[in-house]
């Protein structure tokens, strides 16, 4: 199981995604932990079982156990936070005086470099469409001194994974239906 298997499973109509996935996996401004953590966290965020299995297999070879768990933790906590803060934002400040009451300890103590965890959280927030979390994580990354190019590359990687997951899921559904 690997990114190569994932690329090979993509149908012809997803050729651009195949090329983009090849490109992001080998030519990037992200270091290895940033890249594989981003790929793993965003694969988990897509909820595509096949995409997650293939990326997770290779991510396990490229990340420490702590980074692997932190990337999955970023996807999980953002799954909650993105829904909460996106919804709170839609309600025009009517609930801003109320305490969230949500545990988010992993954000303060992720077990990896804070900037890497923030980067993964940003990429997942892009997939989940939460502008409030995107802005908050981007601001934290900039305060940590992370270059714009690194931030942009993580967003690009997450976008590629989201597109790949969509193509994989569509192809699997249509294949099962024999359409």
Swiss-Prot record:
Function: Antioxidant protein with alkyl hydroperoxidase activity. Required for the reduction of the AhpC active site cysteine residues and for the regeneration of the AhpC enzyme activity.
Disulfide bridge positions per record: 130-133
Keyword terms of this UniProt record: Antioxidant, Disulfide bond, Oxidoreductase, Peroxidase, Redox-active center
Lineage of the organism: Bacteria, Bacillati, Actinomycetota, Actinomycetes, Mycobacteriales
UniProt-listed NCBIfam families: ahpD (TIGR00777), ahpD_dom (TIGR00778)
Homology family: Belongs to the AhpD family.
EC number per UniProt: 1.11.1.28
Molecular function via GO: alkyl hydroperoxide reductase activity; disulfide oxidoreductase activity; hydroperoxide reductase activity; peroxiredoxin activity
HAMAP family: AhpD
Keyword Disulfide bond: yes
Assembly and binders: Homotrimer.
Protein name: Alkyl hydroperoxide reductase AhpD
A Pfam family it matches: CMD
Catalytic reaction(s) noted: N(6)-[(R)-dihydrolipoyl]-L-lysyl-[lipoyl-carrier protein] + a hydroperoxide = N(6)-[(R)-lipoyl]-L-lysyl-[lipoyl-carrier protein] + an alcohol + H2O
GO biological process: one example: cell redox homeostasis
Active site: 130 (proton donor), 133 (cysteine sulfenic acid (-soh) intermediate)
Enzyme class: oxidoreductase
């Amino acid at each position: 199981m690997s990114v190569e298997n994932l690329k090979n499973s993509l149908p012809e109509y997803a050729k651009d995604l195949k090329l983009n996935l090849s490109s992001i996996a080998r030519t990037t401004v992200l270091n290895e932990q940033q890249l594989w953590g981003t790929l793993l966290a965003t694969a988990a965020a897509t909820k595509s079982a096949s995409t997650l299995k293939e990326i997770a297999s290779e991510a396990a070879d490229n990340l420490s156990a702590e980074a692997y768990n932190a990337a999955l933790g970023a996807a999980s906590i953002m799954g909650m936070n993105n829904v909460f803060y996106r919804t709170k934002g839609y309600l025009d400040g009517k609930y801003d005086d109320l305490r969230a009451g949500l545990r988010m300890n992993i954000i303060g103590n992720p077990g990896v470099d804070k900037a890497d965890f923030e980067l993964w959280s940003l990429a997942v927030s892009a997939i989940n469409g939460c502008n409030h979390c995107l802005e908050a994580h981007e601001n934290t990354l900039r305060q940590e001194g992370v270059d714009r190019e690194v931030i942009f590359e993580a967003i690009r990687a997450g976008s590629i994974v989201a597109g790949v997951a969509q193509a994989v899921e569509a192809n699997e559904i249509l294949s099962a239906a024999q359409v």
